[in-house]
């Protein structure tokens, strides 16, 4: 009986410990397919989900989001293990995968739904974001136009958007190349 109790205690304790290490962060950086590819490569990232956030319509659909009828941005939900990576590191990955100076969207995707947004869930995150923006502005002597918004709700995008870069590899590469994403990023970040 003691063994069973110890095993159950260990399972419950380790599950709670694991759950407390699991965190989420939300970034909008233009096309969520490209953002998903970038963050899936980061050590400590457990899962990425393409979706929508920041708007006023509940359960939005892609066709409405890209018509700018919902107030939502194409957003990536990133689930990560905070014992391996942290908010600051993920924010660094975010910056080098967007053009923080483009007020009209990202790369070849223009419009409200493609603008860059960093969502925060608490004041600590907000301060980290604001400091990082100041550092970028000082480095480049340019104004960062990425929005900083309080996170409210996330809606998962349609299934065909999830892992698009893996499921539609050739089509995705053509899109990415056509948007000159890597060229623009190299020009900005080196």
For the regions a language model picked out, list residue spans one by one:
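Sec-dependent N-terminal signal peptides
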Residues: 4-13
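Flexible coil/turn and secondary-structure edge motifs
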Residues: 18-190
